Amino acid sequence: MAASSTATRLSPPRLHAPTTPSPHLPLRRSRFSPLRAAKLEAVLTIGTHLIPHPRKAETGGEDAFFVNGDDGGVFAVADGVSGWAEKDVNPALFSRELMAHTSTFLKDEEVNHDPQLLLMKAHAATTSVGSATVIIAMLEKTGILKIASVGDCGLKVIRKGQVMFSTCPQEHYFDCPYQLSSEAIGQTYLDALVCTVNLMEGDMIVSGSDGFFDNIFDQEIVSVISESPGVDEAAKALAELARKHSVDVTFDSPYSMEARSRGFDVPSWKKFIGGKLIGGKMDDITVIVAQVKAVMIPDDEGVDEEKGQGDEQGSAVAVASSEQKEDSITT
């Protein structure tokens, strides 16, 4: 059965324009282009951090992710299902290839900012044996974030110090999430949870694999975000905190709390003496932190006219692109 839904519109898109100059001051002419109409577009500034499972550090773990700064910005996380190792299959191969194809098909005109369609194309092209949970998020220039997710990779939006949106994990039963697979019995893009969220300038997006969200609470995420000077620092700090919790046998983690709520616990004799299922969950930990920013984009009108005025504007655009564009696949 397909599990597709759309999130409620949370707020109208709002991108703040710069303050209007005083009428008593002369207008300053841009040194890059003639005065003309301009528009605001939403873009993502993205930071990432990955920490493999302690026992998989030498191989890099089974998580993979993809980040691209073109247009508004795109990122994706895939978590290879470790159970395939019992069949002598490297679980990392499927997740890595899936992310590689996500990068390739992002440039396909047919995708056109549709993460579910991108998921379909990337999955269809993946030939490695295995399976993975996955989430893809794409920001349109209007500030609309489109999400497609299969399984228990997650995403949260933080606005003004509060979590105002979270994806919901999909699972067959506890600890058995939906997953894209090389086998016919697995899920497909039609089973994806599809969400649309209207974002505002300054909103923070935190996404990652279940190894991250199983070991950290919302209030900790909000606290780290508020204390971090940038997205790179935030992603690293969040991953390190989740890693610390994951190896702490006394930490009552979100994972252990969920397990107890589903009926999993220590034997009765341990309960009798006050024992309970507790501790973090060791796993690969992938964290992506993105901040929504508004950039002023000149209107297309008059572009041809400017091309004859020298190379200065082209250089400015090239510098902006090199600072904003990030296109990578990391495992």
UniProtKB/Swiss-Prot annotation:
Q: Which cofactor does it need?
A: Mg(2+); Mn(2+)
Q: Which residues form a coiled coil?
A: none
SMART domains found in the cross-reference section = PP2C_SIG (SM00331), PP2Cc (SM00332)
Stored PROSITE patterns: PPM_2
Asked if the Swiss-Prot or TrEMBL record annotates the protein with the keyword Hydrolase, the reply is yes
Positions contributing to Mn(2+) 2 binding: D79, D210, D283
Checking PANTHER family in the record gives:
PROTEIN PHOSPHATASE 2C, PROTEIN PHOSPHATASE 2C 26-RELATED
Q: What is this protein called?
A: Probable protein phosphatase 2C 1
